[in-house]
From Swiss-Prot:
Plays an essential role in viral RNA transcription and replication by forming the heterotrimeric polymerase complex together with PB1 and PB2 subunits. The complex transcribes viral mRNAs by using a unique mechanism called cap-snatching. It consists in the hijacking and cleavage of host capped pre-mRNAs. These short capped RNAs are then used as primers for viral mRNAs. The PB2 subunit is responsible for the binding of the 5' cap of cellular pre-mRNAs which are subsequently cleaved after 10-13 nucleotides by the PA subunit that carries the endonuclease activity. A motif (Nuclear localization signal 1 (NLS1)) lies at residues 125-140. Mn(2+) 1 binds at residues 41, 109, 120-121. It comes from Influenza B virus (strain B/Singapore/222/1979). This is Polymerase acidic protein.
Amino acid sequence: MDTFITRNFQTTIIQKAKNTMAEFMEDPELQPAMLFNICVHLEVCYVISDMNFLDEEGKAYTALEGQGKEQNLRPQYEVIEGMPRNIAWMVQRSLAQEHGIETPKYLADLFDYKTKRFIEVGITKGLADDYFWKKKEKLGNSMELMIFSYNQDYSLSNESSLDEEGKGRVLSRLTELQAELSLKNLWQVLIGEEDIEKGIDFKLGQTISRLRDISVPAGFSNFEGMRSYIDNIDPKGAIERNLARMSPLVSVTPKKLKWEDLRPIGPHIYNHELPEVPYNAFLLMSDELGLANMTEGKSKKPKTLAKECLEKYSTLRDQTDPILIMKSEKANENFLWKLWRDCVNTISNEETSNELQKTNYAKWATGDGLTYQKIMKEVAIDDETMCQEEPKIPNKCRVAAWVQTEMNLLSTLTSKRALDLPEIGPDVAPVEHVGSERRKYFVNEINYCKASTVMMKYVLFHTSLLNESNASMGKYKVIPITNRVNEKGESFDMLYGLAVKGQSHLRGDTDVVTVVTFEFSSTDPRVDSGKWPKYTVFRIGSLFVSGREKSVYLYCRVNGTNKIQMKWGMEARRCLLQSMQQMEAIVEQESSIQGYDMTKACFKEDRVNSPKTFSIGTQEGKLVKGSFGKALRVIFTKCLMHYVFGNAQLEGFSAESRRLLLLIQALKDRKGPWVFDLEGMYSGIEECISNNPWVIQSAYWFNEWLGFEKEGSKVLESVDEIMDE
């Protein structure tokens, strides 16, 4: 931790933090976590101060706005934090006296010359709101509060006291520090600022003690027994000792690997007796239908946006006599339709709230009251009918054509642009010119890719869902599924459907909240009925598109998600980073061969090189070539699909199949790899190929690729034989 602090903070900040600890008789050597917290706190205070200025008339400027006017500007905030305590108190009393305000009972961190208010700054590992109210209870209204969390949220008593750029700088720095700490395995040992405050010792009562004893993991009878086991366990050398005991029983015979030893993975994916893998993404992707409404580009509340879109398509909004096209196994179509009508009425009314009434059909859809009942261990032991539920093993499925179709459609170009990326400043160093050029080419390809529209829809929806889940835990809320796209210079609000959030008392990260989705589509589910067993589908009307009448369907599904999945959904834009890194690796490789920057040559062409082409798929058993831009869109779409269908099966498949890929690469490089228990490795891979659409499709593509590689190896062997002769 000491090395980490030295490397990540300025010397002056570290010295001030150490001086602060010395005043309280604390030793930085013994308490590095406290030193880190003080350094972070100090740095945040300086970031806030360095970003905001006032001129002689008291007008506020940010650092960017004040460029060229530095002579007439002074800091808006006086930093009190970091001063010796006696000097800090003197400064605080002087400022209060000078500006005619009451001196706070506690020492502040900052003083705002504009509002003439003292400010307390707080940093927390938990929720910003929780720490805010903890501080508020202690300080009252004696000073303003600015609370920032490593979880990327904040809470300000005065929202106008800090602009968006200032908030962004602070949160970005906290995220950076958290990532660095996690990398060094220091994050878990770090104590939050709020945890340093002293607690209260109390004796455990009988009820709490009993609850503690029945909460221990299986295999332990009570808490004291578990604590005794942990205190006496010796983890050092345990693995080595067990391996030594097993060694006489293990017989390993290495074998040199040949191309003939490799076989396709997951043979069951070709078994036509198995059902096709169903669509199980959280939202519709290529089958989505957005109700478009032209807008001026101003920000709107989601309810206002949805209301305007529904008003434009009133025939769909007012439909009361739908046609049931398809029904999922456990669905109650009448309840689902009633819930949809309630959603439409909630959005269409004049009230600002989007809260839904807790009707019996809403309770059915959200699973209200259907949670498992917890029973004491003593009762369960005495009752012979009580037993552990058998684990549910996923059913095996075969490959489905719709996955490849989704891939093809999502990687195509459209006329709509939905990608929302922040602006970056002008280039300074020569390397930044290269980066900007590559970014320009990359964004031009990705901007109008269908996958980027779907990605932004996921980002916006999961952001709204997480906000509503935290803000309205006990309420049912209607959440519009929206996006904003730009087409030929015009902005359009898009409404893809509505969702209903159930009760969301999410204490743990894996606690589930029920979400019922209602999404518009022009795809008739009967065309590929094997794709939609999880959906109940109604036909709710038709629209005229380019002079042709198209039926509009409402796809309904009862689903669930948790905090972890919602947070990943908010960060789905990370797919851009991964695809851009792969693009840059290809460009760098080409540039190193040619001896100069090949960015333009890869995307278009230059005076010497024609544009690059890459294998992007197969058609009728032959490889299909595509441009560099097309290959980039395919990579980006694959990254998105990896996020959308990500689960334990995909994680396991990726990890296990990586070993097989390394063996194939070694064969291609003619390194003569040796293996043992090859069939065991295949078994580990195939265990993960069950009912995840992306895993099954990846296995299908892998088998195709393996076939091509085997054919190529035969050609090379024939060439070698001719050369030997």
